């Protein structure tokens, strides 16, 4: 549905920087609440559904837009499929990050990557699309009576704790195309900015199709609540082993919402790679190429430290420890050297996104990673 300007009847689009509706024809600005909304107060709203013939993803746009590039794989293989009426979301977090800011934060992120090729750090943007991703938000009451095992010098003890926790706006993505790995790494969103849904916010952006029912997510909701509950209880108790008994939980409220994500597609050596940016917090994730020889060199350096330097230091410090009885200091220094090298090595690999399973290429369908969602928010 086209949202018209009351001055000239031109199409209105949502301006991220100002948080207002802007007329593309006369450049007039309107507050979101000022725009006439009587035409779409129903529980359903109409979308144009476009499907990608390369990866199978589907996106929904309003009648103002015409999708020609796939936001997921970056290929110009997207075609109109049908007009569809879909459930209207109750809540939305509008885009706070502009297109320019999204590109800038990705460039900054890649420049910090030691293993990232120079050509990738100086990439040219192929596609940069703003997409509202569908989520289910759950309010959950969870209670349990876990018991803990505590070992002391004078014995082995058990004690029990009873506590109730309320989880507010627990996020679960509602798109088959949007893998759990993507959604977990883009979180958390600041739910204080959650607002009532208005169709005006969709103007100028894509929206992913909602295709996962809330009933399908209930088991994952329970698992996530249990993990967070057990972790929090363990932090506040002395026991090292937390044993759940018979947890009770109930969903107090379920809300369908849309959360903002920027999809940036770049090409390197005839392959497409996609980087994602949280449209509210600027958090970045994605997979990019890496320089293999740098990985090999760092690996060999770490190996050299482990095989040559550390044993040498160990011998000297063992002798020092034997003479002075300060073996704790020796162990701490050796351990610190090893951990520092390993932390640098693994940190750079994670920053670069070496995981090839989430690289998008032109000749293959997007793979949904069958990984368990991280249950604890970062």
Please give the residue ranges for each predicted region.
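Alpha-helical transmembrane segments
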Residues: 337-351
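Short, non-ligating residues that shape and space the ligands of small metal-coordination modules
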Residues: 14-15, 32-33, 61-62, 79-80
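Charged, low-complexity helical/coil segments in non-catalytic cytosolic or luminal regions
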Residues: 83-272, 293, 297-298, 319, ...
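Cys/His-rich metal-chelating microdomains
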Residues: 9-11, 29, 58, 76
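Short cysteine-rich clusters marking metal-coordination/redox-active sites
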Residues: 5-8, 23-26, 52-55, 70-73
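Residues immediately within or flanking Cys/His clusters that coordinate Zn2+
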Residues: 2-3, 20, 45-49, 67
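Juxtamembrane amphipathic/hinge helix adjacent to a transmembrane helix
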Residues: 268-291
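Canonical alpha-helical transmembrane segments of integral membrane proteins
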Residues: 298-315, 335-338
